[in-house]
């Protein structure tokens, strides 16, 4: 009988540390619900001590999620662990994930602690965590560059103290598969009582080896993999959940483990995270890329038509790919709209939220005749912005553009109940619109990224715009969608400005695995 492989998703914590990928509480809850629907075992909902906003989001997710363990990260100090324990208190199943660095360079340069002090602090951390839960994970930050003998020593002590999961992170993505697998094998072999805990891996993708390293460790005894949707994460990202899960499932002949993941929810989760964070999925991305099941070669096409398994090792529908289909139109009623949202796994909090979304749907249906599932996802994402998060609100936008003349934009913004109007010229209609908005907002933010993607096919398709703004040490992504690209751009820019302004934005606590 195959052993269970725990899937630990850290999209909401490590994934959110990607530049500009910070999410609101409502967005985090929406992602957490999708992860629960996908049957993820553990959801790392955030870093409770990082900010009041992070604490609140974890606490809300702990109240909402019933079928997955809700986890908070915490440094190995009493305050962090207390905040984590309070945040996960409402959870039906809660975990505290505490960590301390163990590599020589981290202990000396960052912690300024001796190895003995690090071991002592780690043991204390487990004791503090046990006051809140029996499910305690310990991570040795930068284990990939740590001395093996020291890892054996610290893991032995934290297991004695009550840790139930031992995580061996390759924090900077330094290891190669054979090396990482051997580390895992030796740890399990040498650490006393290693059979009493779950051994976990957390790999970063700096050398493009996060998934390979994780799978190599699974073959050597790891029974938890920490990963993120789309491989989202700081620097080059983390191990991609979809690749780990499908590798284990597709190569069941090789891996002695199985997961409980509902793989048909993988693509919906990928699209949701991409939409919320503003990080597009590259077309050739394994499993969830737009081209993952596309065949251009005539020889390949002929083979697939004759027998799918000639060139496909997975079925597209098994990971949640479906053909775009017309689902609703301008004559569709509120109940049909509500039912389709439920089929897509989209839950709105109240009748007021449903009414607002339905009103936006009717506006969209007047602009384009065919409404696809992707349109509904984009529409609901726009409606997740609550009034207290919408300091800047677009009231009116107009652009005059003609051949040989510089475009001129006119915008009206509502700021705190007061309308402000401005006009500006620009190198194009979008440039003019952004300049008009800035002449009112005066944010001083720097535009780092502007990108447009068609949500569906056709000339009447909605354009989904992502903007990335930087101000000081803060980077945020904004999203907006509309059949009018200029309006979508304005919404995206204002969405980013509102995130910069929002009191929910936070300064991340330093550290992480």
UniProtKB/Swiss-Prot annotation:
InterPro entries: 2-IPM_HCS-like, 2-isopropylmalate_synth_dimer, AIPM/Hcit_synth_CS, Aldolase_TIM, LeuA/HCS_post-cat, LeuA_allosteric_dom_sf, LeuA_bact_synth, PYR_CT
UniProt pathway annotation: Amino-acid biosynthesis; L-leucine biosynthesis; L-leucine from 3-methyl-2-oxobutanoate: step 1/4
Compartments where found: Cytoplasm
CDD domains in the record: DRE_TIM_IPMS
GO molecular function: 2-isopropylmalate synthase activity; acetyl-CoA C-acetyltransferase activity; manganese ion binding
UniProt keyword annotations, A-Z: Amino-acid biosynthesis, Branched-chain amino acid biosynthesis, Cytoplasm, Leucine biosynthesis, Manganese, Metal-binding, Transferase
Known EC number: 2.3.3.13
Pfam families: HCS_D2, HMGL-like, LeuA_dimer
Source domain of life: Bacteria
EC top class, as a word: transferase
Cofactor: Mn(2+)
Region of interest (Regulatory domain), residue spans: 393-513
GO BP term, pick one: L-leucine biosynthetic process
SMART domains listed in its UniProt record: LeuA_dimer
Biological role stated in the UniProt entry: Catalyzes the condensation of the acetyl group of acetyl-CoA with 3-methyl-2-oxobutanoate (2-ketoisovalerate) to form 3-carboxy-3-hydroxy-4-methylpentanoate (2-isopropylmalate).
Protein name in the entry: 2-isopropylmalate synthase
């Amino acid at each position: 009988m195959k052993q269970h492989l725990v899937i630990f998703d850290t999209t909401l914590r490590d994934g959110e540390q990607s530049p500009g990928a910070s999410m609101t509480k409502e967005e985090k809850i929406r992602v957490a619900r999708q992860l629960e629907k996908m049957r993820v075992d553990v959801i790392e909902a955030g870093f409770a001590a990082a900010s009041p906003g992070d604490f609140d989001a974890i606490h809300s997710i702990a109240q909402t999620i019933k079928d997955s363990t809700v986890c908070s990260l915490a440094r190995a100090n009493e305050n962090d662990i207390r905040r984590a324990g309070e945040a996960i208190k409402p959870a039906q199943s809660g975990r505290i994930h505490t960590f301390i660095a163990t590599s020589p360079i981290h202990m000396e340069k960052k912690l300024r602690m001796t190895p003995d002090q690090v071991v002592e602090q780690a043991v204390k951390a487990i004791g503090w965590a046990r006051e809140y839960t029996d499910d305690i994970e310990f991570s040795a930050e930068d284990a990939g560059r740590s001395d093996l003998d020291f890892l054996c020593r610290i893991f032995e002590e934290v297991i004695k103290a009550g840790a139930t999961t031992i995580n061996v992170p390759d924090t900077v993505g330094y290891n190669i598969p054979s090396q990482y697998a051997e580390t895992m094998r030796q740890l399990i072999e040498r650490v006393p009582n290693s059979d009493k805990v779950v051994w976990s891996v957390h790999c970063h993708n700096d050398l493009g080896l996060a998934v390979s390293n994780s799978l190599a460790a699974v073959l050597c005894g790891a029974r938890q993999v920490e990963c993120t949707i789309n491989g989202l994460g700081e620097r080059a990202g983390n191990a991609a959940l979809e690749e780990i899960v499908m590798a284990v499932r597709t190569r069941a002949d090789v891996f002695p483990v199985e997961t409980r993941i509902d793989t048909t929810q993988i693509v919906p989760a990928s699209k949701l995270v991409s939409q919320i964070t503003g990080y597009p999925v590259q077309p050739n991305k394994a499993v969830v890329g737009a081209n993952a099941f596309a065949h251009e070669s005539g020889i390949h096409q002929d083979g697939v038509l004759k027998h799918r398994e000639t060139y496909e090792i997975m079925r597209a529908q098994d990971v949640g790919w479906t053909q775009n289909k017309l689902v609703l139109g301008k004559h569709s009623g509120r109940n049909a709209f509500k039912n389709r949202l439920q089929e897509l796994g989209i839950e709105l909090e109240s009748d007021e939220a449903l009414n607002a979304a339905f009103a936006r749907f009717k506006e969209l249906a007047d602009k384009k005749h065919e409404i696809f599932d992707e349109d509904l996802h984009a529409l609901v994402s726009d409606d997740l912005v609550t009034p207290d998060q919408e300091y800047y609100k677009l009231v009116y936008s107009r652009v005059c553009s003609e051949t040989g003349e510089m475009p001129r934009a006119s915008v009206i913004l509502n700021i705190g109940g007061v309308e402000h109007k401005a006009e500006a010229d620009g190198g194009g209609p979008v440039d003019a619109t952004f300049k008009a908005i800035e002449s009112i907002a005066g944010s001083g933010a720097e535009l780092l990224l502007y990108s447009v993607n068609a949500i569906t096919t056709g000339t009447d398709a909605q354009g989904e715009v992502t903007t990335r703004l930087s101000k000081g040490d803060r980077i945020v992504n904004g999203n907006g969608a509309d059949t009018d690209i200029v309006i979508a751009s304005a919404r995206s820019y204002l969405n980013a400005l509102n995130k910069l302004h929002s009191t929910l934005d936070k300064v991340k606590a330093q550290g992480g695995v």
